[in-house]
Amino acid sequence: MNAPADRPQPRFVVEFGKDGTPPAEAGRLDAPAFHRNHEAIWQTLAPYLAAARGAVLELGSGTGQHTVTYATRTPALTWYPSDLQEPHLVSIEAWRTHTGLANVASPQRIDLTEPGWGWTPGGALVAMLCINVLHISPWSVSQNLIAGAGRFLDRNGRLFIYGPFMRDGTHTAPSNAEFDASLRARDPGWGVRDTRDLAALAAANGLALVDIVPMPANNFVLVFAREDRTSKT
């Protein structure tokens, strides 16, 4: 059944491109940002995940398009998408059903504002992935995401975070500074995060920021690993 084209959507969804189009059949959403960034992000993920086995947890999966796209390329991995917003959970399940991928689990609701958040079925993760979340969420989400990586990543696991970031207190482009100001004007708890602050969070949780990979449109992928496994192999 098609959802009404004028169905109200969450405020940040409309404004920050987590979906951007009316739901298609069964609630599938299509995010313009996905089409712009998924291949560039994959170039960073591929060396770690293309031949890996195990479980990957995506936090803030949005429409679900990244999950199903990357799951298609990694048949030996089981992907666990998650989100907090109900329209996103519906969309993720719709994309999972539409693609018929056996290695994508049903989406689960995870609230990263909760310090002790967990995931189902639990256990060690090969990787965690978080795309375009930290700048449109309170600082506690950054804290709890990285703390969760410290709890759940296996010995060789990686946490990948994509989005705009400051570098050592400096914006990487005037447009990012303007974007940051607009975010903080809308919600003082939002804003472009600084890699220096995220690295400090990582160190407090037994992790290290091992790579900062430039992406198109002044974005980056940050790669975190356990402090005793800081090589990129």
Where does each model-flagged region fall?
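Conserved class I S-adenosyl-L-methionine
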Residues: 52-62
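A conserved beta-strand element that flanks and buttresses the S-adenosyl-L-methionine
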Residues: 129
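A short, conserved alpha-helix within the catalytic core of class I
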Residues: 136-149
